[in-house]
């Protein structure tokens, strides 16, 4: 007898990406879905429809068969119709609230979903870290793409003994950042995506002020520019109880809290509804890996931050309210296929002993095998072979 597993395409995959990385995220998911043999419907964010259409144009140039990839534009109602259409898979990147609605709607059709719903990602800096390197990493992790990344550093937890020195270093480096138009190659921090998003940032920063945190730099719109330009903002005296440390901000803010022990650092990192990514900074790599394995997040870096979405071989996804399912690599491909087990009986000379009809000899044989085979007694099991052959002969005579 032999068994093998083959993988079949699911059928139609619906991809609903967010607006923040509106080219790279859906492009990768489209490629993986097509590689797995599926057809794809891409519904780009209503804020970035032309990028979705551009992805469709790219695949037209490679002579993809007609309608294997379709791009449909529209707002949330279009996305809701896609989810409710009964297709085989939905891959969604976006907010927790929308992700829950998608999961509820998809469940009516038993449509499986992959949900990547953002994070509140912690960065832990121990006293033995390379502080210069960690400071540069924190600034890039917090302010890249104006903080509009699901894996942005949104909570900076620093060991108490170095907190003052490290915070000073962060503030100095933040003040040197160049904020300007995004079409200039030397710009460090550009505008945010929308007025709606900058208002969320303003709301969170004001909540930090009300709850006793200190704004060390930034904390307001950049008045030198028109549009949604918010200054890179560093906040000290933050605690995990503050609203701005619990809700996803998705903007250029870097709130700093402190810890005293390794256990407290882990507890603070895990004290969140989210679990997408995290990072640990220390010269002691054994400690770094030990702490990383205790953190409840889909990806944990040691002395690195933010960029791992670009490692195509590794799974991407989160725990808790950050969603479920994975994209990228082996585990991402397995989300896009249905495993089928093929089993073949090559021995065609006799029936199976457990087939009907049953007899007293059959009952005695089954009890003997259950007792001796399951207990690991090979000698006693072998002694049952004559009885087993008798049972097979009994069936062949029926």
Located regions from the model:
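Structural detector of well-ordered beta-strand residues that form the stable sheet scaffold
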Residues: 34, 41, 70, 91, ...
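Short glycine-enriched loop/turn motifs at secondary-structure junctions
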Residues: 83-84, 117-118, 150-151, 185-186, ...
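Conserved C-terminal structural/oligomerization subdomain of aldehyde/semialdehyde dehydrogenase
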Residues: 210, 222, 229-398
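Short helix-capping segments at alpha-helix termini
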Residues: 61-65, 177, 181, 242
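ALDH superfamily catalytic-core signature
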Residues: 97-239, 302, 387
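Residue-level signal for inorganic ion chemistry
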Residues: 37, 69, 90, 119, ...
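Rossmann-like NAD(P) dinucleotide-binding subdomain of oxidoreductase/dehydrogenase enzymes
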Residues: 1-133, 385
């Amino acid at each position: 007898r032999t068994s093998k597993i083959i993988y079949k395409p699911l059928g139609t995959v619906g991809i609903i990406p967010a607006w923040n990385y509106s080219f790279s995220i859906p492009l990768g998911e489209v490629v993986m879905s097509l590689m797995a043999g599926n057809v794809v419907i891409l519904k780009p964010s209503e804020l970035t429809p032309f990028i979705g259409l551009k992805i469709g144009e790219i695949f037209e140039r490679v002579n993809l068969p007609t309608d294997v990839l379709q791009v449909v534009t529209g707002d949330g109602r279009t996305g809701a119709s896609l989810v409710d259409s009964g297709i085989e898979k939905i891959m969604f990147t976006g907010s927790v609230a929308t992700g829950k609605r998608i999961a509820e709607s998809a469940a009516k059709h038993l449509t499986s979903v992959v949900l990547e719903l953002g994070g509140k990602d912690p960065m832990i800096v121990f006293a033995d870290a390379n502080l210069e390197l960690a400071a540069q990493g924190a600034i890039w992790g917090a302010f890249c793409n104006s903080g509009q990344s699901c894996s942005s550093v949104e909570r900076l937890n620093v060991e108490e003994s170095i907190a003052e020195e490290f915070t000073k270093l962060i503030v100095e480096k933040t003040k040197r950042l160049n904020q300007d138009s995004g079409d200039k190659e030397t710009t460090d921090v550009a505008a945010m995506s929308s007025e709606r998003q900058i208002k969320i940032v303003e709301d969170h920063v004001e909540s930090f002020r009300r709850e006793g945190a200190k704004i060390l730099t930034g904390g307001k719109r950049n008045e030198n520019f028109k549009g949604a330009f918010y200054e890179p903002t560093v906040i000290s005296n933050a605690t995990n109880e503050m609203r701005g440390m619990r809700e996803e901000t998705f903007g250029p803010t870097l709130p700093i809290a402190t810890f005293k022990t390794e256990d407290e650092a882990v507890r603070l990192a895990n004290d969140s509804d989210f679990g997408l990514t995290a990072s640990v900074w220390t010269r002691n790599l054994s400690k770094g890996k030990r702490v990383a394995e205790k953190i409840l997040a889909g990806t944990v870096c040691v002395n690195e931050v933010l960029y791992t979405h670009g490692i195509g071989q590794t799974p991407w996804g989160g725990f808790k309210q950050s969603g479920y399912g994975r994209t990228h690599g082996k585990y991402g491909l397995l989300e896009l296929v249905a495993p089928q087990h093929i089993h073949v009986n090559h021995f065609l000379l006799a029936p199976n002993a457990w087939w009907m009809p049953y007899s007293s000899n059959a009952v005695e044989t089954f009890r003997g095998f259950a007792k001796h085979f399951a207990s690991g007694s090979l000698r006693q099991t072998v002694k049952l072979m004559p009885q087993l052959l008798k049972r097979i002969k009994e069936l062949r005579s029926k």
